[in-house]
Each structure stands twice: as structure tokens, then as C-alpha cells.
Amino acid sequence: DPSCHSSQNEQDNRHYARAAKIAMVEPSDAQECKDFVALACEVSELFDTPVLYRTTTRVCHSKGLVEFGQRTEHTHAPYARNVRKFVCTPAHAYANHPLVEERLEKLREYGCTRALENGLNKLEMGDGRVGIITASIAYEYAKEVFPEGTSFLKLGLTFPLPMDLIRDFASKVEKLYVIEELEPFMEDQIKAAGIPCVGKELTGLLYELCLLYTSDAA
């Protein structure tokens, strides 16, 4: 809840995904709110992981025309007893920890490949002078404010970050910016990977972004 419109704080709940080492999906508009639920379920089934489906106040208060695709029927999978997986004793947790780390690596690879094909992540190359990595409602603001020719890497799968994709994108632009609300969640990880970028120096740590704040950064 950036700017505390209906809560006592504006804590950045993206950190929960990182702490729990699970996938996180963030839509930026009404169409994606519908589409990304199906993609989040796909991610969950493919990688046997919980998915944190994160929406912010501004995304939840948005509205727009939404196209529906063909309805897909799914059969319920039968219950299979799996004590090692579902009973988290110390011995089971010890054995399962490597599986969690392997899952994160597979999710990173998915973010660089399949997620680009199904629209979960989106790459929009411009003239190469300015590149912006962004997600959620910040993408909508940046698209409206920054001039034509700006390159965008718009992430719907925001944890784990597809670092190889980000590194490749960074190599194709002269100046790289990270635009996100609240904490420098993506920015810190990108800098930790040795990729120079500019972020909170321009947009700040407080409150939700808007066209005015984003235009100041531009």
C-alpha cells in the first residue's frame, strides 16, 4: 500500500518472496491482472512452487477493458501422500533445501526464456540511449513520461530476477535506470550482480510514484 492509503504502513512485501525463496508475479494493469493469474498458476505447476501474486493499491484501483481467451478446463490432480514434502521436520527440511535452490535457478532461466515468450516479461528495445527496468504500475508511468526511443525491460516475474536477461539488456543501452516504488528491491539485486544502474537517487524511497515524480526523474 504505497502512500498508506488504507493501512498503517507502506511496507514493501516483495521481500517476503525473497525471504521465502518463492516465485513472485506482478501485473501492471487490468488486462495483466487477469492474464497473469493463469501464468502464475503455470509457474506454480511447472516448478512446484508457491507464487506470491503481488498487486499494489494503484493497480487494484485501476480499471480497463479486458479480453478473455478460450476457457481451459483442468482436471483435478489426485492427492498423493508425500510425507517428505509436506511434513517439515528438520530431516526433511535438510533434504529439501537443495531442491529449493535448484528451483530458483530454474525460475531464473524461465524468466530469461519462456517468460519472454508468454508475455510475463517484456522487452521493448528503442534507440539504445536510455534503458529502463521496471515493473507493476511504475511501468505505466514510465511509458507515459519517457520519450519515444526509450528501451524498456518490463518484468512480470520479479523474483527471482532474470539476471542474464538484465545483463544482456544493460549491455545494449548507454544509461540504465531502475524505476520501482518503495524499496530498491530490484535495484539492489542488479547492483549486487555488478550491473551499474541509477534508481532511488532519482525516485526516492517514500510513497507511491505518479506521473509528476516520474517526470522529474525523466
Each predicted region: which residue ranges?
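Conserved PLP-anchoring active-site segment centered on the Schiff-base-forming lysine
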Residues: 218
